Design a protein with these regions (language model features):
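Long, solvent-exposed N-terminal ectodomains/accessory regions
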Residues: 36-39, 68-72, 115-117
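Solvent-exposed serine/threonine-rich low-complexity stretches and specific carbohydrate-binding patches
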Residues: 154-168
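Histidine-/acidic-rich catalytic cores in large beta-rich domains
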Residues: 74-104, 111-114, 119-147, 173-174, ...
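N-terminal Sec-pathway targeting helices
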Residues: 2-20
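Long lumenal/extracellular ectodomains of secretory and single-pass membrane proteins
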Residues: 50-89
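Composition-driven, intrinsically disordered low-complexity tracts enriched in small residues
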Residues: 2-3, 42-57
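Short coil/turn motifs at secondary-structure junctions
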Residues: 152-154, 195
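Membrane-interface motif at the C-terminal end of an N-terminal transmembrane signal
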Residues: 21-45
Length: 379
């Protein structure tokens, strides 16, 4: 090869390298923006597969459909008739009220008698837990309910039913059965016990639970640690999982998914307990309270702010939230106060001005910084 041709190849290689050097920062910026933008994305498709429509509530604009749970338990699924509208969300108090009233009409239907052997069963009635099963029935005497979920190859899951009344013993039973494994045939045993501990009734049924909405694995790898302390009997809650934003996952001690929470977006960065309800972030700009039936009882829209990322209790019972003003270059620089009674959102501190001297010596994140996925942002 001649010297002249070698020089041509060297020049061409140099041009390519320069072009790549110029494109890499652009690619980093575009990739980082896409990465952070997913946190602000809100769900636009709430639709799901279900069976035939068996009835309709014209007053509450809700379709009653057959839940596709196999040949065992017969259950319903509630489908708001506006579910495909562009601005629809389950995290809307009006939508929740319509679903609640539909459930009340079913409970109070004088033509039907709901018993333990033939309960009112509704899969995910409030749209917040894809594998949560609502049960309602009455007993002749005040009793308590416990249940066991058996799936071949997995450890049995046993829990006490948390009745919506808050009572341990009652004649009217209304609760959400948690623990059904998605994508599996679940054999459920309900044990109905009297106040003296005697078993008054045992009910068996199967639930062929559909796959997860998210596609996330229902079985995690479990590694035995060195601690000798006993594990709690509750469920582990996973925070935001990239690639699966818009969901919250609850796993038992054996790494089996027992509940898949369906959110508007974002993820469960923090779950607070508010009486018998949980309070959590259901999108980057919304907080919600959810009761034990999966019903959303309160929603707070943060308006021009996005969470980033923690929430906690204030001294006077308000919620404090770390946030940022949408569209600003500065991020994670606002402290908000949210009044749980009024839903009023107040900005308490703008750290960019509160710590002005420190802010003046900082700069936006560069493509070569450790937090390169936030390139261009003033963190």
């Amino acid at each position: 090869m001649s010297v002249k041709r070698i020089w041509k190849w060297m020049i061409l290689a140099g041009v390519v390298l320069l072009a790549l050097a110029a494109l890499i920062p652009v690619a980093v910026v575009l990739g980082s923006k896409a990465f952070t933008a997913q946190e602000q994305a809100a769900r636009t498709d709430w639709s799901f597969s279900t069976g035939d429509v068996v009835a309709q509530s014209s007053q509450w604009q809700v379709d009653l459909t057959e839940a596709d749970l196999g040949d065992g338990l017969k259950a319903l699924q509630l489908v708001p008739q506006d579910i495909e509208d562009e601005d629809f969300t389950y995290y809307d108090e009006d939508v929740q009220e319509r679903l609640y009233q539909t459930v009340q009409e079913l409970k109070n239907n004088s033509d039907l008698e709901w018993t333990a052997s033939m309960p009112l069963a509704i899969l995910n009635p409030y749209g917040t837990g894809s594998n949560g099963l609502y049960l309602y029935f009455e007993t002749d005497m005040a009793t308590s309910v416990s249940y066991t979920v058996h799936v071949d190859g997995l450890t049995d899951f046993t829990a006490e039913a948390a009745d919506a009344s808050g009572k341990e013993y009652t004649k009217t039973h209304e609760f959400q059965l948690i623990g059904l494994v998605p994508g599996e045939v679940n054999e459920v045993t309900l044990t109905i016990s009297g106040k003296w501990g005697n078993t008054r009734q045992t009910i068996h049924f199967t639930v062929d639970m559909p796959e997860t909405r998210s596609g996330y694995s229902t079985q995690l790898k479990v590694t035995e640690g060195e601690s000798t302390a006993a594990q709690a009997d509750g469920l582990f809650t996973m925070m935001r999982v990239n690639g699966y934003l818009g969901y919250g996952f609850f796993f038992d001690n054996d790494g089996v998914m027992r509940y898949e929470m369906v959110l508007e977006g974002f993820g469960l960065d923090r779950v607070l307990f508010c009486g018998d309800e949980i309070l959590t972030c259901v999108s980057s700009s919304k907080l919600a309270r959810i009761n034990g039936l999966g019903q959303v009882t309160w929603v707070c829209d943060l308006g021009e702010y996005d969470l980033h990322h923690d929430i906690g209790w204030g001294a006077d019972g308000e919620v404090l939230a770390l946030a940022e003003e949408r569209g600003n270059d500065t991020v994670e620089d606002r402290l908000l106060s949210i009044d749980l009674e009024t839903g009023e959102v107040t900005e308490l501190i703008n750290f960019s001005t509160f710590l002005q001297e420190y802010y003046d010596i900082t700069r936006p994140v560069a493509p070569t910084d450790d937090f390169f996925w936030q390139v261009g942002e003033w963190d």
